[in-house]
């Protein structure tokens, strides 16, 4: 499935707009990860533990969005937007992704009437 932040895909015609698709993931802060991150912050550098958690959360949200687009018989998602939101006094983070599921010409999927 093609996924892009742009509203169109160059060289491909959009036959049908299937609708909005979203994916969300919520991750909680781990106390041990927080301790390691604070040590990293003191000595400088990047926190691999946090980066890995964010990448996993992002990938899960995108996969959820792709699954929803597949159920709508889409073969691409355009106009994708990715957001990160911290809530619960910094104890939780939500990764959300949204876009428009579409059926591109020359791809798999069945045009809906």
UniProtKB/Swiss-Prot annotation:
Pfam families named among the record's database cross-references: YbjQ_1
Stored InterPro entries: UPF0145_dom_sf (IPR035439), UPF0145_YbjQ-like (IPR002765)
Family the UniProt entry places it in: Belongs to the UPF0145 family.
Name assigned to this protein: UPF0145 protein SynWH7803_1684
